[in-house]
Structures are given as C-alpha cells and as structure tokens.
Amino acid sequence: MYEISADPARLDVARVHRWLSTDAYWALGRSLAKQQAAIAGSLNFGAYATDTGVQVAYARVVTDLATFAWLCDVYVAPEARGHGLGTSLVTAVRDHLAPHGLRRVLLATDDAHGVYAKVGFEPLAEPGKWMVLPLAPVPAGQDRRGRQAEPTASAEPAR
C-alpha cells in the first residue's frame, strides 16, 4: 500500500534527484542544484510505502493555481511499477488541482500515454498551435528530449 502526499517536508530530494538524473530520459544528468530549484518552484507529490515510509514515486507540477499547470517529472521507482501506482499518483495530482478551476493541465510523454489517458488526459486537439522556445543548448550527444542522439551521416562520401 502507498500513501500519496503533497507535503514538501516528506520528499526525499536525494532519491528524487537520483531517479531523475540517472533513469529518466528527460532529465538525465540534471544537477542536484537544478533539481532543488525545480522542487522549490513547484507543487510536489510523493508516494510513500505505508509500511516503511520510503518514497517510491514522485510528480511535480508547475502552476499558478489559477489558469494553468504543467505536470512533469512523473517517476515511479522500478520496484513499485506494475501495480497502478503511476495512475494513482496522477489521479491524486488531478484531484488536488481540480478545486482551483484550472482550464487545463499539460504534460509531455514518450511512453506513458495509457497511464495518463486513464486519468482523463487526451492528445492536444490542435498541436500546431503550440510552440516551444528552447533556451538552453542541447548537451553533446543528446537530442532535445535528453536521449542519446542518433549519429548523423557525414557530408563526405565514404571512400
């Protein structure tokens, strides 16, 4: 069993940082200082094993709690996966935000569409209306999503 909480004092920041910086494709290599700043400027949720109190999942929401929210950094520890915890965590986030009257909550995912669909997320109706402003350079060897970049073909013909 798990307990989900938005109490920032319960977060195991070192554990969250380790998960995201070493195992989450979108945050590989993220520094501890960057993670601490992200936590400080966000609404954070943790899932904790009820028998041990150990944190087993995390989610972060960037929001003004008036008009908009961005759900990000959703992570379930490998040993806790496959039991519906991701869906429960995102449901708790949705339920926490619902009373605020936000028009929408956005997220980006490469591989968990099914989890989010169970909670009510759907693809953008008009994705062509959305744009991104990349501000930070892409680290060498990575693409914009933080994944290992595919080798590019050389402009020189092979000899």
Question: Where would I find each of the regions flagged by the language model?
Answer:
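Short loop segments at secondary-structure junctions
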Residues: 50-52, 79-80, 134-137
